[in-house]
From Swiss-Prot:
Protein known as: rRNA biogenesis protein RRP36
Composition skew (Acidic residues), residue ranges: 32-43
Coiled-coil boundaries: 219-267
Record function comment: Component of the 90S pre-ribosome involved in the maturation of rRNAs. Required for early cleavages of the pre-RNAs in the 40S ribosomal subunit maturation pathway.
Biased composition (Low complexity): 78-87
Residue segments, region Disordered: 15-167, 312-345
InterPro entries the record matches: RRP36
Lineage: Eukaryota, Fungi, Dikarya, Ascomycota, Pezizomycotina
Transmembrane region(s): none
Any GO BP: maturation of SSU-rRNA from tricistronic rRNA transcript (SSU-rRNA, 5.8S rRNA, LSU-rRNA)
Gene behind the chain: RRP36
Localisation per UniProt entry: Nucleus, Nucleolus
Length: 345
């Protein structure tokens, strides 16, 4: 390149950094202003276009109305009445089929998109209605469930967790009520009567039974006296209603006392059977015939008691016991039979 051309070149002074930043800011601001002006122009154009479209639609509507008016004038009143009746029936059907309240329809209209003629959108709207109904049904207040009864009498009582705690508080606890105590079967009295001997204290009930054995004779005497009173009232010539009630009361008392005495005798016989069995087992172990004792079960004890009572009975008592036993067995067998065969012997 020749030197003359280089000398003829124009040289511009170098800008500082501050001047460069100022220049760049001005350029950016100018560009933003241009963009805003262009956006405003486009918005103005869109508004003008919308206004023209609205004017066109209004003109079209006016023309359509003007076209419909002369056609309505030619329609007869009978055709209008039929059309109104048909429209009324359709409206009733639609209102009867839909059980949605106006509030729900407003909510659904807000939530649903713009209406369309396509079947897919109608199906989606129906699904939306059903889902909304399910949601409202789930959120509805359920009736309060009643408390169920206890599974058994040993189970704790059922109470609602919302049950309010009583505001009353026990400041002073009442004194314990005095309880009656029978000294015959009291452990404190029996331990003193045995003089602190542990072997006799373990059999305190046996000692109490031996100490108060005379009460059994009193019971037998009382039962005999009550039977005499019953026989005297039954043989009375002029019996009143009060006498009849007294006879019933005395008979009830006799049966209760005799049952109590019979139970006491049965327990005594069971105790004697156990004592005799223990003695035999101890003798066998002492003789070396056995290494370990055999302990009777409750069923075996009952069988031995029945056998012992049967041997001690007289002839008539045995016959009565056997007859009662036979009737009991027959009744059990008849219950197990089918209903049609129960009457046939």
């Amino acid at each position: 390149m020749p030197i003359s051309s280089k000398l003829n070149q124009r040289v511009r002074a170098r800008l500082r950094e501050e001047d460069f930043e100022h220049f760049s800011d001005e350029s950016v601001s100018n560009e933003s202003l241009d963009e805003r002006e262009s956006n405003e122009d486009t918005e103005q154009d869109n508004r003008d276009q919308r206004e023209t479209d609205d004017d066109d639609t209004e003109d079209d509507g006016h023309t359509e109305i003007s076209d419909i008016n002369p056609s309505l004038n030619t329609i007869s009143f009978g055709a209008l009445a039929k059309a109104q009746a048909a429209l009324g029936k359709r409206k009733r059907r639609t209102t009867s089929t839909t059980d949605i309240t106006p509030k729900r329809t407003k909510v659904l209209s807000r939530q649903s998109p713009t209406p369309s003629t396509s079947s897919n959108k109608e199906h989606d709207q129906g699904q939306g209605l059903s889902e909304f109904q399910k949601h409202l049904a789930s959120n509805a207040k359920k009736p309060p469930q009643k408390l169920t009864h206890r599974t058994s009498k040993h189970a704790p009582t059922i109470q609602s967790s919302r049950h309010a705690v009583s505001r009353k508080r026990t400041i002073i606890e009442p004194l314990a009520a005095p309880k009656p105590r029978d000294p015959r079967f009291d452990s404190v009295v029996l331990s003193h009567s045995t003089n602190g001997n542990p072997s006799t204290a373990a059999n305190a009930d046996i000692h109490a039974r031996n100490n108060y054995a005379f009460l059994n004779h009193y019971r037998t005497d009382e039962i005999a006296e009550l039977r005499k009173q019953v026989s005297a009232l039954q043989t009375k010539k002029k019996k009143t209603e009060r006498d009849d009630h007294e006879i019933v009361r005395l008979k009830r008392e006799i049966t209760s006392m005799s049952d109590r005495q019979r139970a006491f005798e049965r327990k005594e016989m069971e105790r004697e059977v156990l004592v005799q069995h223990r003695r035999r087992e101890k003798e066998l172990i002492r003789e070396g015939k056995k290494s370990q004792p055999y302990f009777l079960k409750k069923g075996e004890v009952k069988k031995e008691v029945i056998a012992k009572r049967f041997t001690e009975m007289s002839g008539k008592e045995k016959q009565r016991a056997l007859e009662r036993r036979r009737k009991k067995v027959v009744g059990k067998e008849r219950k197990e039979m089918p209903w049609g065969r129960r009457g046939v012997e």
